Amino acid sequence: MFQVAGLIVFCGLLAQTTALLEALPLGKALPLALDQSPTDLVGSLTSTLSNGLLSEGVLGILGNLPLLDILKAGGNTPSGLLGGLLGKLSSTIPLLNDIVDLQITDPQLLELGLVQSPDGHRLYVTIPLSLVLNVKTSVVGSLLKLAVKLNITVELLAVKDEQGKSHLVLGDCTHSPGSLKISLLDGLGPLVPQDLLDSITGVLDNVLPGLVQGEVCPLVNEVLSHLDVTLVHSIVDALIQGQEFVIKV
């Protein structure tokens, strides 16, 4: 008797649940569980961009920048910027005649930053990069070891095409003015005067930002083209509506 009553109650509850589910529009049964908060969107975007850049080989590209070739090919003298620098200073520091290489080591992609434009319709992603630059000589090996940090700033725009498909596209992509930081990690003590360090960093100031920008920005564009469709749709909708992203500082 008790088993029959229990079965009747269970069947009644099942019928009510079925009726409620049928009343919901198809594809909208669990809208809250699928939606991401603005904070989640920011975390998902920066994490995806970071992983994408690593997958595209950004560290290998940084480690193989043709810096020495570009320095030798530039400038107003036949021997290029580096040759001009060495010629100017070799009379006081003979070791400079023996410089044979500029080697890049320890390239790193640091934690990405993100800010939203005041109108709420654009995002700016900061891509902090770092590396160590070794100026080598044939006589003593490493003459200078410089720590280099540089930020690339990427503008992300939300667009929808004629078919209504959402796209997150690359706007401006440039090195952040004043973000290049060069510091001396190691050197041969008194053999490395300040004017030498200033001269080398001055050359790097003119060459390195544009070189890194030219390599990294195409990678960002490639990563954007492979973003998860659901993530792109959510971000584009939020930007078009001017929804404020919650960004943790």
UniProtKB/Swiss-Prot annotation:
Location of the region described as Important for surfactant activity and antibacterial properties in the Swiss-Prot/TrEMBL record: 81-86
GO cellular component, one term: extracellular space
Cell compartments where the protein resides: Secreted
Keyword list, A-Z: Antibiotic, Antimicrobial, Disulfide bond, Glycoprotein, Immunity, Innate immunity, Lipid-binding, Secreted, Signal
InterPro entries cross-referenced by the UniProt entry: Bactericidal_perm-incr_a/b_dom, BPI_fold-superfamily_member, Lipid-bd_serum_glycop_N
Gene3D superfamilies: Bactericidal permeability-increasing protein, domain 1
Range of residues in the leader sequence: 1-15
Pfam family, one: LBP_BPI_CETP
Keyword Secreted on entry: yes
Disulphide connectivity of cysteines: 173-217
Expression by tissue: Expressed in lung and trachea.
GO BP terms in the entry: antibacterial humoral response; antimicrobial humoral immune response mediated by antimicrobial peptide; immune response in nasopharyngeal-associated lymphoid tissue; innate immune response; multicellular organismal-level water homeostasis; negative regulation of single-species biofilm formation in or on host organism; regulation of sodium ion transmembrane transport; surfactant homeostasis
SUPFAM superfamilies documented for this protein: Bactericidal permeability-increasing protein, BPI (SSF55394)
Annotated glycosylation sites: 151
A GO MF label: lipid binding
Quaternary structure annotation from Swiss-Prot or TrEMBL: Monomer. Interacts (via N-terminus) with SCNN1B, a subunit of the heterotrimeric epithelial sodium channel (ENaC); this inhibits proteolytic activation of ENaC.
Family, per entry: Belongs to the BPI/LBP/Plunc superfamily. Plunc family.
PANTHER family: BPI FOLD-CONTAINING FAMILY A MEMBER 1
Function: Lipid-binding protein which shows high specificity for the surfactant phospholipid dipalmitoylphosphatidylcholine (DPPC). Plays a role in the innate immune responses of the upper airways. Reduces the surface tension in secretions from airway epithelia and inhibits the formation of biofilm by pathogenic Gram-negative bacteria, such as P.aeruginosa and K.pneumoniae. Negatively regulates proteolytic cleavage of SCNN1G, an event that is required for activation of the epithelial sodium channel (ENaC), and thereby contributes to airway surface liquid homeostasis and proper clearance of mucus.
Protein name: BPI fold-containing family A member 1
Gene: BPIFA1
